[in-house]
Amino acid sequence: MAFGGLPEAVSFQSTACSWCGHLLASPPVNSFTAMKIATFNVNSLRKRLPIVLDWLEQQKPDVLCLQETKVQDSEFPLLALTPSGYHITFRGMKSYNGVAILSRKKPEAVFHGFDDGGDSEDARLLRVIIDGIPIVNTYVPQGFEIDSPKYQYKLGWYDRLRKYFEKHLSPDKPAVWCGDMNVAPRPMDVHSPEKHLKHVCYHEDARKVYEKTLAWGFEDVFVRLYPNRQQYTFWDYRAPSSLEANKGWRIDHILATAPLAEKCTRVEVDIEPRRAKDPSDHTFLWAEFSV
């Protein structure tokens, strides 16, 4: 969650010795038998590098999707990240937005942004294909205020995203969509929901357009496994005691089409990085699939 002419998405693999758009990678490894996919709104990658590197070392996800990296491509911290052994794909801009995907295996294809001829999506959408599975990473606009043009832009962004799914994916084939959606879908996904009816991340129109996008063919795997569990992924900086009081929001999500959702075996929110020194206001969410 945030209030606030780009180059091609860059894909970097650690064994490459030269830049060529999408670089050559390490030799392929065997296909996954299980895939652990994580998402994290990092709220400035350069500021949270120690948190990201520590989490990669401890949790060893197969794929990590990052949002709000807040760094233009020319300043992306490749040197700090490549020793981790991950293939790194990113698309950013100065000071705002930005998405990246770190993966153990080289993506078979990389795509960025909408291709509908509309306005720039400001480094908010990145799609890769890994082991034949499309993985879409999104940082959805927050919307600012209900009466703001930014809120209408957010609603329209979801409409564009649903059409993007219709064009590029199939609900009958495995696919993952994850990221900071800036929507708390249910009353239990936000503290004191009655006080947030006009908040851009809980307003009725935002929830409706989000559910309409899901109805294309995605299922929230957290809700699938734990339909009655109240757990948050975001705690506002502006309320210093929000974490201790657990006054948060569940606005970061991992979703999958039916063929993959039914193979989801575990979903967890790791709250410890939110307790770290100089943390993001979000924390890591991860899911494991038997593939």
What are these regions (language model features)?
Residues S95-V110, R229, S242-K263, F289:
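Conserved beta strand-loop-helix elements of the APE1-like EEP
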Residues M35-S44, G132-D147, C178, H282:
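Active-site-proximal beta-strand elements of phosphoester/diester hydrolases
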Residues F40-N41, L56-S74, I135, Y164-P187, ...:
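Active-site beta-strand/loop signature of hydrolases that rely on acidic residues for catalysis
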Residues D115-D116, P141-Y158, E194-H199:
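Surface-exposed cleft-lining segments at the edges of enzyme active sites
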Residues T69-Q72, F76-E145:
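Structured beta-strand-rich core segments of catalytic domains in phosphoester-bond hydrolases
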Residues E268-V291:
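Surface polyanion/phosphate-binding segment centered on an Asp-His-Pro turn
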Residues S84, W157-I251:
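Metal-dependent phosphoesterases centered on the DNase I-like endonuclease/exonuclease/phosphatase
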Residues S14-H22, S26-Y86, K94, V99, ...:
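N-terminal, active-site-proximal structural segment of metallo-dependent hydrolase catalytic domains
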